Curated annotation (Swiss-Prot):
Homodimer. Interacts with esc, Trl, E(z), scm and ph-p in vitro. Found in vivo in an esc-containing complex, which may be the Esc/E(z) complex. Also found in vivo in a Pc-containing complex that may be the PRC1 complex, but does not interact with Pc directly. Interacts with cyclin CycG. Residues 20-44, 105-126, 239-274 form a coiled coil. This is Centrosomal and chromosomal factor. GO terms for molecular function: chromatin binding; DNA binding; identical protein binding; protein homodimerization activity. The lineage of its organism: Eukaryota, Metazoa, Ecdysozoa, Arthropoda, Hexapoda. It comes from Drosophila melanogaster (Fruit fly). Keywords: Cell cycle, Cell division, Chromosome, Coiled coil, Cytoplasm, Cytoskeleton, DNA-binding, Mitosis, Nucleus, Transcription, Transcription regulation. Essential protein required for proper condensation of mitotic chromosomes and progression through mitosis. Binds to specific polytene chromosome sites, many of which are shared with the posterior sex combs (Psc) protein. Involved in maintaining Abd-B repression outside its normal expression domain.
Length: 550
């Protein structure tokens, strides 16, 4: 019985089935002894069945059954007495009739139960006989017709788990392989960002399309595909209209004109993000208006110059539009050349040209004290993103507009050169991972620009930005050795076989520096820092033999 109970424990259905099979076997044994009267046997069986099936109700039912049995025994004793000696005293006859009435009531109740029981018995006999035909059971305890509980899911149980109390089943640990679980988890939709309010989502998408806060999303892509000559013509047209409007120089008209031009400027912002050199004189004049309160005399002289310039431009445009279009198309072509070089990099680095062309928006945000783009991802998660984004975007945009012409006018340098940190590091926590970490040696972002130092700008600027005094050599070597530069993992592996051991190299350089400071020139271990990369015999023909995985 123990094994059968263990198997039956899995399933309440299999439990009841096994119990009925057991009772059927007992019934067969009982039916072989048919000497008992059938009513008694059925009573006995009814007691048994009710005991097994409803263990909770058992006490109450047993009381009922005992009452019925007593009444039946009365009936069995009294009925023959009634029939044989009808000449007995009236007293006993009255008592007998009373008991007979009670017994008749009980009888009608019993006959229904008996009919139900007989039907059950017949069914159980049939099932039992078919069972014994199919698989003759060696022990009456186990019924092999019930299929075992088979479950394909793999469950492990921890070895030291305490055994469950009897009648409870073991709590299975359903083991999912962690890799699979991690994959499915990463494919779920995030509960945070997707639940942004509809308003916040709309606002953030509108700021995207305006191209102000983040380098142009949809509109920027569309503009990039448009031919650059049409963009140039559009810029020239806007410039002529702006110049006609600007010939009255009163302040209130300037303010009205700002309102009027803001729509044009919004449409041109995405163009600026992609073609910065092409900045039409419209935007420059607009920015100068903003600055006029501070430097009025200088701005007025500049503006008169620019007005004459743009006037001649507009006249030539009216005379022969082809020549002016060609003149601006040349600017656009120069910008597009740089743009292609940048796009090639951006395709590899997954950076927006907006970031790469205006890195000083980075500096502007740093200088203004509140990093505008700072907690963007956290704000999106907490849901407060939509409210702040647009305002901070406009603020940052105006800051950039004010700072840019100042830089261009005061010292006529190109905007400060790109350094690896401001490119690879956006200040959201996910961007700490460089996102190109699997691309090969060519992806090193400094290599593109430092190898071709444009007009000495790279060597001059990267000294101020990056490694400080260490850069003092040629621009190329300095920028490649910049301390902040991170190389990708594969590239580091690929270098490792051809490089001197890093500790040894550092030690030799430190020795050289110390010796130079002490003034001994007698022993210079490999090189002075200036000629380091150029003339050093760094054992590059030897493979590096070392067990260090540095």
């Amino acid at each position: 019985m123990t094994m059968a109970a263990c198997y039956a424990n899995y399933d309440m259905s299999s439990l009841s089935h096994g119990m009925s099979a057991l009772s059927a076997l007992q019934q067969q044994q009982q039916q072989q002894q048919q000497q008992h009267s059938q009513t008694q046997q059925q009573h006995h069986h009814q007691q048994q069945q009710q005991h097994m099936y409803h263990a909770a109700v058992a006490a109450h039912q047993q009381q009922l059954l005992q009452q019925q049995q007593q009444q039946q025994h009365h009936r069995h004793h009294h009925q023959p007495a009634n029939t044989s000696s009808s000449s007995n005293s009236r007293h006993s006859h009255a008592a007998a009739t009373q008991t007979q009435v009670a017994a008749a009531v009980a009888n009608s109740r019993q006959q229904q139960q008996q009919q139900q029981q007989q039907q059950q018995q017949q069914q159980q006999q049939q099932t039992a006989s078919s069972n014994s035909n199919a698989a003759p059971a060696p022990s009456p305890q186990k019924d092999y017709s019930i299929p075992l509980h088979v479950d394909c899911s793999v469950e492990y149980e921890l070895p030291n788990q305490p055994k469950p109390p009897a009648g409870q089943r073991v709590e299975p640990l359903l083991m999912i392989h962690p890799c699979y679980f991690r994959k499915m988890e990463s494919q779920r939709r995030s509960p945070f960002v997707n639940n942004m309010h509809a308003t916040a989502r709309a606002v953030s998408s509108s700021s995207l399309s305006s191209g102000a806060a983040l380098g142009g999303g949809g509109s920027g892509a569309a503009v990039a595909t448009a031919p650059s000559s049409s963009a140039a013509r559009r810029g020239a047209r806007a410039a002529t209209s702006a110049q006609q409007q600007q010939q009255q120089q009163q302040r209130y008209q300037q303010q009205q004109q700002q309102l009027r031009q803001q729509h044009q400027q919004m449409s041109q912002m995405s163009q600026q993000a992609h073609y910065p050199q092409q900045q039409s004189s419209l935007v420059r004049q607009h920015q100068q208006q903003q600055q006029q309160q501070q430097q009025q005399q200088r701005a007025s002289s500049n503006q008169s110059q620019r007005q004459s310039q743009s006037q001649s431009q507009s006249q030539s445009h009216a005379a022969n539009s082809a020549a002016a279009a060609a003149a601006q198309a040349s600017i656009a072509a120069a910008a597009a050349g740089q743009w292609d070089q940048l796009a090639a990099l951006a395709a590899r680095t997954a950076l927006t040209p907006h970031h790469m062309l205006h890195p000083h928006s980075h500096y502007a945000a740093k200088g203004s004290g509140g990093g505008a783009g700072g907690g963007k991802r956290d704000a999106m998660i907490s849901g407060s993103y939509g409210q702040t984004a647009v305002a901070s975007g406009k603020l940052q945009q105006s800051q950039v507009q004010q700072q840019q012409p100042q830089q261009q006018q005061q010292h006529c340098l190109p905007p400060p050169p790109w350094d690896a940190t401001s490119m690879l590091m956006d200040r959201s926590p996910m961007a700490t991972v460089p996102s190109n970490y699997q691309a090969g040696p060519d992806t090193n972002p400094m290599r593109l620009y430092s190898a071709t130092p444009t007009a000495g700008a790279a060597s001059g600027g990267s000294a101020s930005v990056g490694g400080g005094g260490a850069v003092s050599g040629a621009g190329a070597t300095g920028a490649v050795n910049t301390a902040t530069d991170k190389l990708s993992g594969k590239y580091r592996q690929y270098l490792r076989s051809q490089r001197m051991h890093p500790y040894a190299a550092a030690a030799s350089l430190n020795l050289a520096a110390a010796a130079a400071a002490a003034g001994q020139t007698s022993f210079v271990p490999f090189s002075s820092a200036a000629t380091a990369v150029a003339a050093t015999p760094t054992f590059q023909h030897l493979p590096q033999i070392s067990c260090y995985n540095v």
